[in-house]
Amino acid sequence: ARHIRKTISIVGERIHHELNGVSCIGIEEVKNKKNIISSKSFGRKVMLVSELEEAVSNYVVRACEKLRAQGSRAQGLYVFLRTSPFVDPEKRYSNGMSTFFSIPTSNTSKIVKEAKHLTRKLFVYGYEYQKIGVMLLDITDAENEQYSFYEYENYDQSDRVMEVLDGVNSRYGSSTLTLGAQGIKKDWRMKSERKSAAYTTNMLQIPVVK
């Protein structure tokens, strides 16, 4: 061990001990995120509020998947949108709004509804929008929360629905089951013609040997 320390360092010596069954490297637990952001620039300029609502719904879905994956619920939501910062000053617009839920939630449908409401309030006609995004705020651990009987029943039913949704999408590929608010065409997205196939997350894209 001393020879290892001289030639590699004390870190190398610790690794040597670990490989020989002597625990000397502490395990640090990965903490859950307190805020979760989901956002991406559009593939083209967007001027319709309906397309902004569709985009924000998709970003909420992704954020909620991450939220439930770490066993958490969000107490609030922040939505922001903006034009390109490089256009003429009179054509620039950037704004954001937040809202807080009466009780913490991880229900995608509920958060999508609030996100669309905030998007409509933020939207100003005439601008060419380049980006919209969401942030889930004040995230809490679902296991540590206390509920009334009424709240528990609602949570139980909501959790079962979300569990089925996540289970199907995890097994058969992302977006196998989607909300109507997410739209179908989604031509506001970044162009993905050069995007690699999702071999590890979408069964339909697994190559077939003939």
Question: Model features per residue range: what roles?
Answer:
Residues 1-126:
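DNA-contacting surface of Y-family translesion DNA polymerases
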